[in-house]
A protein has these predicted regions:
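Catalytic phosphate-donor-binding core of small-molecule kinases
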Residues: 2-12, 31-40, 47-86, 123-225, ...
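Short acidic, S/G/P-rich loop/turn micro-motifs used as interaction or catalytic elements
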Residues: 14-18
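Intrinsically disordered, low-complexity regulatory regions in eukaryotic proteins
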Residues: 23-24, 136
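Structural motif
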Residues: 91-92
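Redox-cofactor binding/interface segments in oxidoreductases and associated redox assembly factors
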Residues: 95, 117, 226-227
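Short, acidic/turn-prone active-site loops that include or flank metal/cofactor-
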Residues: 99, 120-123
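Short glycine/serine/threonine-rich phosphate/pyrophosphate-binding segments
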Residues: 100-106, 232-237
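A short, gly/pro- and small-residue-rich
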Residues: 105-121
């Protein structure tokens, strides 16, 4: 039997300001640290917290690499910031970081390669409680990550032997002026003016495969957010949306901070785009941006551009954490 091929997709260390930036001795090899910069934090507890986050992340990477080294696998690792090509010729992608790292890797995957997320730095509730009056000590959420350092080998073995099967999650597809954009969003997209203080002007309607259209809604607002079922627990929920079953192929949309909507328009500013529908958006600002799963992937748009948003995208195979598999809504 051919040896299976695994890609280890890593969160970089430059998201953790090292202690050396504050003038103290570095705790980690120079090769793992970003170029020195001025860290304004002086609270020793903040510095110790940042130092520990980097250490925990490094320890998790070391553990994952050690586990892979001891198995009959062909594997290689890459930092997410150094990757820009479609992922091919592998049997499994393992991300080490949090949800952001998993989302970044998903942009390079089609529906054929499964992905397993390892939360390298989970939040410690006791730490959060102890430091609540000083700073926010929450770490990585890892909502879609099935593994941590504590159970990585167990989850990996179950994935490789087929006893832990990946789930297929819906993604968002977008066409710009009829041309398919190459990125599919696993969580959500945001369409807005690039300046958050500026008004976004656009109109939208929903259209079915049979050609039936809803009424046109003209908007002045802070933008448009569209989420998948997986993304409905993130920014969409924070903005007042609702959680969708992970198996849903529908999309949820919400107009952000609408300006003086009419009474007839108000019920239409938040709703669902069904699987057999797509949303047509016409942009009326001189400039605009479409953000895919956060701020890293951005497409520019301009006045008169038409966006077609739908769930007509290849699904993503994700090894989900146990608590999501056990949800009754699934």
């Amino acid at each position: 039997m051919a040896r299976r091929r695994v890609l280890l997709f890593l969160k970089p260390f430059d998201v953790y300001p090292p202690r050396q930036c504050a003038g103290s001795a570095a705790s980690f090899p120079t090769s793992l640290s970003p170029p020195p910069s001025q860290l304004r934090a002086t609270n020793p507890k903040v510095l110790s917290y940042l130092d520990d986050r980097c250490r925990v992340h490094k320890d998790t990477i070391d553990l994952c690499q050690s586990v892979l080294e001891n198995k009959s696998l062909d594997w290689t690792s890459v930092q997410r910031n150094n990757f820009s090509q479609p992922i091919r010729d592998v049997d499994l992608v393992i991300t080490v970081g949090g949800d952001g790292t998993l989302l970044r890797a998903s942009h390079f995957l089609d529906s054929s390669v499964p992905i397993l997320g390892v939360n390298s730095d989970p939040t410690c509730p006791k730490e959060v409680d102890e430091l609540m009056d000083e700073f926010d000590a929450r770490r990585s959420t890892g909502y879609l990550c099935a593994a941590t350092a504590g159970n990585f080998e167990q989850i990996l073995d179950a994935t490789l032997d087929g006893s832990r099967r990946p789930s297929e999650l819906s993604r968002i597809s977008m066409k710009l002026n009829g041309i398919q954009l190459p990125t599919y969003a696993l969580n959500d997209i945001l369409v807005s003016h690039p300046c958050p203080a500026s008004v976004s002007r656009f109109s939208f309607r929903k259209r079915s495969n049979t050609g039936e259209s809803s009424c046109l809604i003209n908007c002045r607002s802070s933008g448009l957010r569209v989420s998948t079922a997986a993304g409905s627990t993130a920014a969409m929920l924070s903005a007042g949306g609702f959680v969708m079953p992970l198996s849903s192929r529908e999309l949820q949309y919400m107009i952000r901070e609408p300006i003086s909507p009419t009474d007839s328009d108000k019920p239409l500013l938040h709703g669902l785009v069904k699987q057999e529908q797509h949303m047509l958006v016409v942009w009326y600002n001189q400039e605009g941006s479409v953000y895919f799963d956060g701020s890293h992937v951005v497409h520019s748009i301009q006045h008169g551009d038409t966006l077609e948003i739908s769930s007509y995208a290849p699904t993503l195979k994700v090894v989900l954490p146990e608590h999501l598999l056990m949800k009754p809504s699934e």
